[in-house]
Amino acid sequence: MTFQVELVSPEAITYSGEAEMVIARTLEGGDIAFQPGHVPFIGVLAVWSVEVIRPDGDRDVFAVHRGFVQVAGTKISVLSDVSEKSSEIDVERAQQAKDNAEQKLSQNDEDIEAVDALARAELRLQVAGV
């Protein structure tokens, strides 16, 4: 049994297709796995990965930078500020962003923007397999 999944950001639809399971991390409930027949749900996403397990067993992993997940009937929608498929992440750019954030934090460890930038860069690198 499958359901329809869409990952959408302001720039693009990064995934649209069938899936057997979606795994995400919410701010309120931690990691959660959605399968067909899941009760209706709306949650706030953390800066973390979203994993889509397709009917053929293959997995697609996305770096998601905050947003919302909604389960309604046979459809799951992930709406996020940024959604990047693992194979499309620019590793060099992510490493540079990480280095820049670490440099800013070495000068001011309370710089909230640098803390957020570091979390996003580390997520991109993790999802890209670095």
Segments and roles (model prediction):
Residues 83-130:
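Acidic/glycine-rich phosphate/pyrophosphate-binding loops and surrounding catalytic core
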Residues 6-95:
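Compact, glycine-rich, soluble single-domain proteins
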